[in-house]
Amino acid sequence: MNSFPWLTIFVVLPISGGSLIFLFPHRGNKVIKWYTIFICIFELLLMTYAFSYYFQLDDPLIQLTEDYKWIQFFDFYWRLGIDGFSLGPILLTGFITTLATLAARPITRDSRLFHFLMLAMYSGQIGLFSSQDLLLFFIMWELELIPVYLLLSMWGGKKRLYSATKFILYTAGGSVFLLMGALGIALYGSNEPRFHFETSANQSYPVALEIFFYIGFLIAFAVKSPIIPLHTWLPDTHGEAHYSTCMLLAGILLKMGAYGLVRINMELLPHAHSIFSPWLIIVGVMQIIYAASTSPGQRNLKKRIAYSSVSHMGFIIIGICSISDMGLNGAILQIISHGFIGAALFFLAGTGYDRIRRVYLDEMGGMATSMPKIFTTFSILSLASLALPGMSGFFAELIVFFGIITGQKYLLMSKILITFVMAVGMILTPIYLLSMLRQMFYGYKLFNAPNSYFFDSGPRELFVSISILLPVIGIGFYPDFVFSLSVDRVEAILSNYFYR
C-alpha cells in the first residue's frame, strides 16, 4: 500500500477547495472563476507530478493503492488505486475540467454555486476512475450525478428543466441496476459484503447468475455511455446545457460508462462478457449507422454534435467487445481521443452562440468571413472528428478495425460484415460534419446583424482551442503515448480471459 495518500488528495482537494468558494463575496465573479481555475491547475500539476514519479508504466498491477477502513459498522473500506487503464481518463478529467472552467464566460447568476458544482463534479469523476471498491464506485457514480443535474437545470436554454429531468430519470434508473449488481456480487457466497474489486475478480459465479449481474451493470453503463436505445437523454441534454457543462459531459461523463464496461463487466464477469460481446458488437455497428444517419436531420447545432458523439461511442463498444489486444487498446485510444474532440466541438459551438445567439443551423451562414479563427479551428476539429489521418481519431478507429479483423473470437464472414458496415458508418460521418460546416460558415448571413456580435476568437478562446488541438494532433502522430499507458494492463485483462 502506498505510504502517501496521493489519490485521496486528488479526490478530496477539488470539492474541499470548492467549499471555500461560499466564503467569497457574491459579486466577485472574476475572483471566484480564477480561484476555481487555480484549484484545477494545481490539481492537474499535482497529478502529473505524482504519476510521473510514482507510477510505473511497465507494471500492469494496481498502483498507488490506498486501503482504509471507513465505516466500522458496515465494514466499508476507502479503497483507491490506479493502473494503466485508469490513468488516461484521470488525466483527461483534469485537463478538460481546467479548460471547461477557463472557457466559461463570466457567470452572473449564482456564480459561487456554478463553480462549486464544477469542482464537485471533478472530485466525483476522479474518485470513480480511481475506485477499487464496488460500493465506493457506486458512491462516486452518484456523487457525480448531483452536480450535473444542478448544472443542467440552472444554467442553459429554455428547456433546461426538461432536459435535466430527463437526464436524472435515465441515470437514476440506471443507478438502481448498478447498485443491485454491486450488492449481488458483494453478497454472493458470503454473509458479509465483499466489495473489493480484486476479491470479486477472483470469484467464480454460476453462468446464469453471472449473466444476471452482467445485464444489471450493462443497463447502468449503457445509459451513461450511451448505448442505443438508452441514448435519448443525450441530444436533449447537450441541446440545452451551458457549453462548459457540455464540455464536461462529452469529454468525461460519457467515458465513465465505457470505463465501467471494461472495469466491471469485462474484468469481473468475463464469461458473461464473452457471451454478450457478439450481440453488443451488432448494437455498436447499428449505433454508428443510426447516429450518423440521424445527425444530418438535426437543426440544433449542439444536437447534431451530440449524435456524432453517439456514433463515435459505437467504435468504443466494438473495441471493448472485440476481446482482442488491438481492439481494446483502440477503444481506450478512442475514449481519450473523443474526450478531446467532443469537448472542443461543444466549446466552439458555444463561442459561436455567444456571438450570433443562434442554435439552429438553418438560421446561420456566412460566418467564415467575419470569424476566420473560429472557422479555422472548427474546421480542423471537425476533420479530426471524421478521423482525418494525422489526427487522434484516425488511429483510434483504424486500430478498432484491426482489432475486429485480427480477433480470434469471430468467424471470417462475421468480421467482413462488421467491418463493411463500420466502413459505411465512416462514410456517413463526413456527410453530416461537412454539411454542418457548410451551413454555419459558407453562403450568406441569415441572421439579423443588429443582434449579433461579429468579433473573432479572443485570447481566452484561442488558448482553449489550441490547448485541445495540440494533444489531438500529437496523439495522431504519436499514438504510442496513449498505448504506453494501457498496453500492459490490456494484456493483463485478456491474458487468462476464458480460463477463470
Curated annotation (Swiss-Prot):
Main localization category: plastid
Localization, UniProt: Plastid, Chloroplast thylakoid membrane
One Pfam entry name: Proton_antipo_M
Catalysed reactions, semicolon-separated: a plastoquinone + NADH + (n+1) H(+)(in) = a plastoquinol + NAD(+) + n H(+)(out); a plastoquinone + NADPH + (n+1) H(+)(in) = a plastoquinol + NADP(+) + n H(+)(out)
Family per record: Belongs to the complex I subunit 4 family.
Coiled-coil residue spans: none
Keywords carried by this UniProt record: Chloroplast, Membrane, NAD, NADP, Plastid, Plastoquinone, Quinone, Thylakoid, Translocase, Transmembrane, Transmembrane helix
The keyword Translocase appears for this protein: yes
The protein's name: NAD(P)H-quinone oxidoreductase chain 4, chloroplastic
